[in-house]
Amino acid sequence: TVMAVGKKAMMMHGKTHEHIKTIIPLRDGVIADFYAAEIMIREFIKMIPWKNTIINYSYRMVIGIPSGITEVEMRAVHDSAEQAGAKEVKLIHEPMAAALGIGIDVLDNTGNMIVDIGGGTTEVAVIALGGIISNKSIRIGGTELNEDIQDYMRRAHNLSIGERTAERIKIDVGAAIPNIENPPEPIEVNGRDIITGIPRSVHVNHEEIAHAIDKTISKIEDTVISALENTPPELSADILQNGVYLTGGSSLLRGLDKRLSSRIKLKVQLGEDPLLAVARGTSVALKNFNKFPFLI
């Protein structure tokens, strides 16, 4: 029996008893549990407000995938969508979806660089003429940052915290650099003392978190540099002019744009509503199901 899906299920994560199990169907941007992924898609379909719509079960579906995905992983995404009831399925690489989602004309001959930092992967791509010219994909994203924070809390404060608490810390006081304008107030974090086993709280500030996630942010920067090194000169000129666009939930980390800009010596800007960029772009692709040449 499925009790909850999405946010409601996430609220239960780490709090369940033996008769309830929370499952994360996707890991590192790909399907980790085929059956759970199929159920999740089915439940999401049920959430669609079908008002003023003739209910038609021959669904068309567009799904975002990491650009570094294997053929087998791609097939798994395709199959799970079909098992959930989709009749026509197309896949879109997430950097392409992110570009569409922030309003870039991806069919134009001007090159644009997208850095999409999702939950399981970071995608860096140079896009022009409806294609991905140069791309790098690493299986590092928001989840890895949460793990860094959990690890730091264990080492620095002898405090064991759950994944959801780490996510809240990242959102409330997360920063990519210690020196930021308008720093957030320190927050109180509750967890379990590793030595005594008793619940305890500590205060955590943005400087601590900047230190905790520093190595992972450096890996993301290295990936951006690697993609720039593989970009043709004509497109490099476009990127110099247009800058680099950041999308994805973890791009909202305070000071990340400034840190990346000082490392690559290019203008770095946050895309509009970066958290929903890929979802919005996938929606644009769905409306152009048979028009866009880059849908797989």
List each model region and its residues.
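Nucleotide/phosphate-binding catalytic cleft detector across ATP-hydrolyzing
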Residues: 1-117, 125-245, 251-296
